[in-house]
Amino acid sequence: MTLPLLGPMSLSGFEHPWFFLFFLVVLGLVALYVIVQMGRHRRMLRFANMELLESVAPKRPSRWRHLPAVLLILSLMSFTVAMAGPTHDVRIPRNRAVVMLVIDVSQSMRATDVAPNRLVAAQEAAKQFADQLTPGINLGLIAYAGTATVLVSPTTNREATKAAIDKLQLADRTATGEGIFTALQAVATVGAVIGGGDEPPPARIVLMSDGKETVPSNPDNPKGAYTAARTAKDQGVPISTVSFGTPYGYVEINDQRQPVPVDDEMLKKIADLSGGDAFTASSLEQLKQVFTNLQEQIGYETIKGDASVGWLRIGSLVLALAALGALLINRRLPN
């Protein structure tokens, strides 16, 4: 947690836990203080004439005289926690990552169960995703129907990606596996170019589709969607799938109404096989929310951050109060 004016504080994730041995020193000081106070009390009892003692000694201090010592002990405890190096989770924007946005442009995307139609709604949500994605991430775009095409290689230029999204055109058939394989190739290519570390940059595929793969007919074929998902898993590239549409969608083909219900099951299996997440949306607003959630998930990473500052500041504040209390409470000179 982070407290106003004090900063981050935590009681977990200690980097130097052996500093807690200093608590033994603190306990020793507590024991020493108790022994000194007990000895002081015994010496007072040995004074034969208590009335004379009270007349010549300053007014006996109240129990408040122990407050400075208590505050000193608390400050030492706070400093001990700080020295142990507590940490907390910190979300920071990714500056080195690749995201491939893979969009289905098969004829089923003409369905109007999502106004004005599935493709137009997908374009609007995809552009919002591009705008919201953290600036350091390289975003690429692939459109697929019977074949897959890299429209924009991974880049931080969001305007180029949005311009390509606006130009998406419908085509026949649905080769989901080819779309995934093409995305994996683009990820590998840009990973070799970006470099900048001991390992390739983290990558993710965001696959947006409304229906079942038609080419090939068996998704377990060498070029099928399930095979591609397993390959993505092996390469450490999870796939986040977004199934978009309703069970009641249809398109007109040769004056015949052809049902094109959304296929949530296939897209969920693709996500599961790749180690990614599956999302569903049946309206434009739901789709926008899905992409907002994806942006939060993809655009940031969680790292361990220092959480000792708050303990140091509390310890310093309590130590200052202990010194002030010692001056005000235990002073010997009368006003």
UniProtKB/Swiss-Prot annotation:
HAMAP family: UPF0353. It is a multi-pass membrane protein. It is found in: Cell membrane. This is UPF0353 protein Mvan_2751. Residues 98-294 form the VWFA domain. Belongs to the UPF0353 family. The chain crosses the membrane at residues 18-38, 67-87, 309-329. Keywords: Cell membrane, Membrane, Transmembrane, Transmembrane helix. One of its GO terms (cellular component) is plasma membrane. The keyword Transmembrane applies.
